[in-house]
Amino acid sequence: MKQKTCAIQDSYDAVKFLNEIKNSADYKNAKSVLVNVFTERIQKDYISYITCSIKKILDKAKVSGLTCLQGFAQGDPVKGTTILTVFLFEKSEIDVLEFDFVKTPVEEAKKAFVNKMKNLKDLKAIQVYTTPLQNKITNDFLSSFNLEEADIPIFGAGAGFEAGSVPQKLLVFGNEVHKSGIVITFFRGKNLKVYAESTLGWTPVGKEMEVTEVIDNHILKTIDNILAGDIYKNYLGVTSSKNFLENTCEFPFMLRRSGKWLARIPIIKDENGCIHFTADIRKGEKLVFSYGAK
């Protein structure tokens, strides 16, 4: 597998980079190609133009992407640009499955996902891009297949947004652009090897607290039968819903699953005092505050 990344400022940069890829020996020798796109420009027309250009110039390519606060190129954050990362596989194969939850009923999407999983051979990894907060069913959707038991690494991201921005502007995209949806990329190959490592730069602190009530998988209502918003007031002195993310992001909750620590960063406190997350929280789990280890 070969990887090439470019930070582009406009569509001219994109076309130039894509043509360079097309004329390369790596592209000509590739069996399959994936282009991941990360963009700060929450403009459907711009995104559609970029994705159409990719598919027109690179006829082998599958596309997946999302809107985000900032992209990363060569491991460094890059502000004010769109990032294109091209993966070129000589022997492995790529499949992309996407659902728009405005158009497709959740149960129908779940069945299609499970059927796809059952029929894929030599599946080695899954990448997921989704619109957090837009579709409350994302976590439930992914749990329709036991990925841990199948020992298939899963990784990805949720579309990001600036603090105070309107969540409706979050977008993910594959063949189409979705305001409420999910784009799943399957990596397959008999000789493909994917090394997955879990790292977390947070250190747990304080006592464990039990999740006692959850709404829609990702809205925490009570902890130890105390309103979740009051927990932040009592321990961190955060009383206002305004700038809630900025005031709490340095002290995320941590929980253990399958022997590994996971972090849950609250992004919103609603008018009822409930705390919203972009990933699932389960009733009965033990939460503990944490702080940055470095």
Question: Over which residues does each language-model region extend?
Answer:
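Small-residue-enriched flexible segments
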Residues: 1-55, 61, 66-68, 75-125, ...
